[in-house]
Amino acid sequence: MGRPRILILGGTGEARLLAAALAMRGNGDVLLSLAGRTEKPAAQPVPVRVGGFGGAAALADFLKAGGYHLLIDATHPFAERISANAAFAAEASGIAAIALRRPEWQRLPGDCWYDVQSIPAAIEALGPSPRRVFLATGRQGAHHAEAAPQHFYLIRSVDPVEPPPALANVDYVIDRGPFTLEGEYALLKRHRIDAIIAKNSGGAATYAKIEAARLLGIEVMMVARAPASAVKTVETVEATLAAIDHLFPPAMKRGV
């Protein structure tokens, strides 16, 4: 085997860091695939393809046609469909697969979390009385707020929510993390937020809102992750690199 060919399914900070580390090593051919949902994606250190594959079978065909040896699923922890497609495609094409998943946030003393399984369940858990809600789940889940229009919603996303949800009492924040504790604290105070809906994405980039909620005594409707797939899972870029070294010894990666 020559240089290993690696396809990274990205869209996260971890994917970018992993791609940068592999590019610095220079001992494999790496392609980073982005779904294309973000209008202005961050610059990437390796060649990039943008857009979906058309399903699990089409992804398997792409892997086989491209002669890939490894598929790395470094998508968002809540990109369940993409992760399921990745697991199927790796098995169908007979190549190795690794899932890079940052650890979940853990409840700490002072946290007021209400565990839910979905964004609709979080909306329902707000109750019937009007509340002031920070909906911090991104633009794709924003339309669920239409089920409970009695609340005020502060909706934050990287790109504008299109079409906007049919809500009478809503404000929007267009911003990209990482966010600071000071900034999140001020945001929650300024909008008089008394409830947050958040996905348990893990990582440091968006954790500040959870810290600020703890300090302010704000309830958090925490959406749980779906069960992990059967793909080998690691939690850090370093662990991913170690797994790659195990799969492809140095002589193989040099093309020797």
Please give the residue ranges for each predicted region.
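N-terminal basic/disordered segments at the start of proteins
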Residues: 6-36
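N-terminal beta-loop-helix "entrance" segment that forms/cooperates
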Residues: 31-54, 111, 165-170
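Short, polar loop motifs at secondary-structure junctions
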Residues: 32-40, 100-106, 139-142, 157-163
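Glycine-rich, highly charged phosphate/nucleotide-binding loops
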Residues: 46-63, 174-183
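Glycine/small-residue-rich loop that forms an oxyanion/phosphate-binding "nest" at active or ligand-binding sites
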Residues: 59-120
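Internal active-site segments that recognize and position negatively charged phosphoryl groups
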Residues: 120-154
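Histidine/lysine/aspartate-rich catalytic loop segments that bind and position anionic ligands
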Residues: 146-177
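C-terminal functional extensions of proteins
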Residues: 191, 200-212, 220-256
